[in-house]
Amino acid sequence: MKDVESRVMAELFKNSRRSDRELAKQLRVSQPTVTRVRTRLEKEGIIREYTIIPDFSKLGFKLVSIVFGRLKEPVSQKTISDLRGHAAEMRALEQGNPSPTIVSMKGIGCEADYVSVAFHKTYSEYTQFIAYVRQFPHVKVDQIKSFLIDLQDRSHMRYLTLSVFADYLLRTKEDS
């Protein structure tokens, strides 16, 4: 990643609402340069979306679950492709999900094959989510373990933030 790209990314991690003009002023480059860099980062898929990080407890969510699952058998690439190919069916299935799931990915560790992170308004909603995970089509679940986070507990060490990537990007750019 070029220096100007890293700097634009760092500023966007801090605040993605800033205009290209504001970014250009902060970075001491021209506004068209910022626009070109941002457009290129979007086209290359480095920037996938612009979003906010709210106080989820003020939106009514009380729990975050990090769910680790082990499968009885691996899900084949063909099955994954088939599921992606049936987008309408997947949207309908997702609408049956009682909780917003922010990530669901295959991986390794904690005696698990996949991990999901979801938000829940009640413990009952969390248990419905676990039932939803167990009945997912074409996936045979062997074991599920969860880690629950109480969003109303004010003694957390660090709340969700992406702004830490700003310093990281700039620091690692200097090291390379």
Predicted feature locations:
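A compositional/biophysical signature of low hydrophobicity enriched in polar/charged and small residues
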Residues: 1-176
